[in-house]
């Protein structure tokens, strides 16, 4: 608790009202950006990592509360259709891919090619009037992207998915993750672009280099390379702001708080090494901590030198699956000395996400209620009036809030079911259900869980067999139980059991309270 009070005191010393300094510290285009030009339907959206999709099998994905049936064709072009058969509106994602490469509905066998053309109706001749709705799709940097605006006359060739140059560099290693969060898209964007919350929600003090202070102000820039396409960026000197106020206390915070980044010692050491590599507190280089939001989906954060180069970048893709729901996809891209197994990264990241996901879920009903009330009154929600911004780090949130004020009310299907905006906060067992949100959609994690369950079964069975054999020989249960082999096998089984628990709900109130100490 002392460490948390120290952080609060140090932050209080650096807080300032961003509304009084925003103009001086913000650089924009020659005139204020017109966010009303943003068109949700004129962009590509990432819906899944291709490695998480089975090859030549149908899978359902969701975007703007609309379901799509997608097929990962491996080395061939993917295909995507709206997830309803024109015959009787059954879900195509419940069907299969035929040997001819057609999506076949499981209800009556109607089959469709990648263009949506009906190729077979089994009992009648195919007709252009019986087509399914095809959606342009493509694979870029391991992500499957959809372009939902083609049916509304938008041109998928006029815009391209945003790319991460480092992901194309063979010198960089990349580890990806996915989680379906019960958090609204706008809230998640604000959360990722808010470095201050790392000090409290995550106890990750090294991330303080992304925060701002009076001595190290945050610069916000807005670019519009083409009409309706924006890049909103923040930049600040990549130095520990706490250390500039009180070196001794700041270092105590760094060593005391950030080292509780994960609950498992082995994971904690690996993640601390990665976090230190990412933040580089000990580095003497003159670096800039930069975060860039490219609406609608991409956020990139990293330390960059004067030439714009980085050793590590964290990139996020947020797919707005629906009101109050977002598919969170991320990639750590860096010149790392080693590759981290994907399932191990997921253990650490799930622990990390659990620390603030329920906090966002408690915030969500109030924000969506305010949006609902504003929509009823025929006006957009004004976040600068709803929130009480006070930190110099929140200057980028002020700017992003302006974008959200203009863009969110135009989100497809946003108000189709108004009651979704009025949903209460679910219990933490729901908001932090790792199995439903992550394990079910990640084959690497499912494989790790399957292997751990097998190891648990074999270890405990072997431990029981060894103990039973010693009982038969020694005639003493107590002496048999003391067998080093039996104890070792039992411990191995327990470790496997604990590992399985990492992929289901585990962040209860008791664990939260331990993190807050």
Enumerate the predicted regions with their spans.
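Short beta-strand or tight-loop elements
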Residues: 43-45, 66, 133, 218, ...
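A generic helix-loop boundary/linker signal
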Residues: 1-3, 14, 37, 55, ...
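Generic N-terminal initiation segments characterized by hydrophobic and/or small/turn-forming residues
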Residues: 7-8, 12, 60, 178, ...
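N-terminal mitochondrial targeting presequence
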Residues: 1-23
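A short, structural micro-pattern
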Residues: 41, 131, 138-140, 310-312, ...
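Rieske [2Fe-2S] iron-sulfur-binding domain
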Residues: 15-23, 27, 32-38, 46-173, ...
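C-terminal catalytic domain of Rieske-type non-heme iron oxygenases
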Residues: 33, 77, 153-517
């Amino acid at each position: 608790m002392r460490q948390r009070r120290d952080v609060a005191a140090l932050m209080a010393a650096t807080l300032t009202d961003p509304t009084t300094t925003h103009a001086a510290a913000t650089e924009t285009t020659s005139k204020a950006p017109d966010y009303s030009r943003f068109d949700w339907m004129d962009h590509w959206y990432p819906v899944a990592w291709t490695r998480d999709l089975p090859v030549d099998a149908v899978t359902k994905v969701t975007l703007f509360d609309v379901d799509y049936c997608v097929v990962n064709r491996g080395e061939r072009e993917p295909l995507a259709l709206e997830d309803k058969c024109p015959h009787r509106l059954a879900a195509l994602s419940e069907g299969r891919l035929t040997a001819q490469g057609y999506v076949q509905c499981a209800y009556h066998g109607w089959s469709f090619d990648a263009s949506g053309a009906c190729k077979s109706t089994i009992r009648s001749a195919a007709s252009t009037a019986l087509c399914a709705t095809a959606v342009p799709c493509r694979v870029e940097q391991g992500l499957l992207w959809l372009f939902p605006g083609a049916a509304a006359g938008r041109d998928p060739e006029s815009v391209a998915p945003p790319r991460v140059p480092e992901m194309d560099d063979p010198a960089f290693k990349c580890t990806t993750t996915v989680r379906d969060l019960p958090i609204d898209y706008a809230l998640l964007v604000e959360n990722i672009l808010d470095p201050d919350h790392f000090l409290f929600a995550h106890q990750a003090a090294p991330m303080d280099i992304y925060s701002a202070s009076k001595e190290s102000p945050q610069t916000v820039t807005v670019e519009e390379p083409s009409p309706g396409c924006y890049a909103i960026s923040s930049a600040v000197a990549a130095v520990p702001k706490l250390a500039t106020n009180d070196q001794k206390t700041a270092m105590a915070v760094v060593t005391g708080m950030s080292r509780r980044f994960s609950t498992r010692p082995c994971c904690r050491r690996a993640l601390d090494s990665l976090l230190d590599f990412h933040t580089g507190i000990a580095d003497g280089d003159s670096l800039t901590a930069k975060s860039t939001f490219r609406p609608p989906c991409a956020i990139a954060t990293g330390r960059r030198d004067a030439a714009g180069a980085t050793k590590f970048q964290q990139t996020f893709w947020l797919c707005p699956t629906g009101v109050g729901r977002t598919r969170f996809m991320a990639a750590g891209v860096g010149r790392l000395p080693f590759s981290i197994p994907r399932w191990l990264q997921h253990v650490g990241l799930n622990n990390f996400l659990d620390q603030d996901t329920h906090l966002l879920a408690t915030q969500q009903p109030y924000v969506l209620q305010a949006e609902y009330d504003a929509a009823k009154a025929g006006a957009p929600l004004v976040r600068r009036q709803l929130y009480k911004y006070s930190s110099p780090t929140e200057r980028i949130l002020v700017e992003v809030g302006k974008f959200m004020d203009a863009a969110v009310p135009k989100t497809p299907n946003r108000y189709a079911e108004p009651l979704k905006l009025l949903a209460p906060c679910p219990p933490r067992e729901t908001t932090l259900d790792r199995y439903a949100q992550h394990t079910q959609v990640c084959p690497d994690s499912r494989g790790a869980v399957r292997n751990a369950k097998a190891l648990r079964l074999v270890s405990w069975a072997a431990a029981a067999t060894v103990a039973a054999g010693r009982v038969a020989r020694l005639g003493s249960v107590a002496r048999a139980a003391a067998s080093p082999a039996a104890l070792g096998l039992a411990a191995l089984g327990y470790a496997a059991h604990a590992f399985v628990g990492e992929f289901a709900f585990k962040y209860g109130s008791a664990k939260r309270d331990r993190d807050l100490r």
